[in-house]
């Protein structure tokens, strides 16, 4: 063995390779677990025809109770508007019309992919509250718990546009986007753990995570937005609202969402120009859905 003048031992080449091998071994183990998790939890969503990742150990009931818990927490922190006031009744009226068309629209979209709908929203306990707030926001949690913020009313301007936003939110819950995000987070954690255990320094880890965010998680979130736009538009059209209001609505939304943005309308939302192009492309189909499912004479 070579000895340096200060008496320190040179690391022998064999040892270095062993450490490197261990690192790669750990990374491979995590990669194998990640791949196993990914492939064993993938299903096809009949409504979108897309392969999605939802943890099989998370039941619809678990998801509903998580939604309910979050809902109660939000309502206890915010200022819900008296349900007997006209604004609350109007919003509930829109919600009821949309909810009444969920089964028809799910079945029609699933049929386009040659599939049967899951009808998993059958067990939803729908509820809608109006929250007194400046935010131009709305949400629908797993299990059908919805809220519309009063700040959305002047941006929506009319019931057709309001129905487009609420349809979009309902679609997120129907498509189980929350559960999909949870599965994504699980995979991200596996990646983080692998990074930490294989001895990546925090800076390297951050770089990898940032790359994943831009390359993988963010487009994934945008895809959810695009899916919710489509399913929501079909719901609004089937419930006899005018889907063409979607275009001016998202234009107004783009203008109002300058500085502060609420969680739902954050950077995960598609670029406004792309979104409007997508909506315009969907318009013939939306009008066809209205023809088919709206019993009201136009
Ligand atoms: Zn959304």
Label every model-predicted segment:
Residues 3-15, 38-170, 174-186, 239, ...:
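Peri-catalytic and regulatory segments of divalent metal-dependent proteins
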Residues 23-37:
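Hydrophobic membrane-insertion alpha-helices, especially the h-region
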Residues 178-210, 247-250:
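Post-HEXXH active-site segment of zinc metalloproteases
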Residues 229, 242-298:
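Extracytoplasmic and endomembrane cell-envelope/extracellular-matrix remodeling and assembly machinery
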Residues 160, 222, 283:
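Short, small/polar residue-rich loop motifs at catalytic or cofactor-binding pockets
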Residues 96, 164, 189-192, 196, ...:
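Generic alpha-helical structural context detector
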Residues 15-23:
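Membrane interfacial helix-start segments of signal peptides and signal-anchor transmembrane helices
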Residues 61, 199-248, 263:
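Metalloprotease/metallohydrolase-associated module, dominated by Zn2+-dependent proteases
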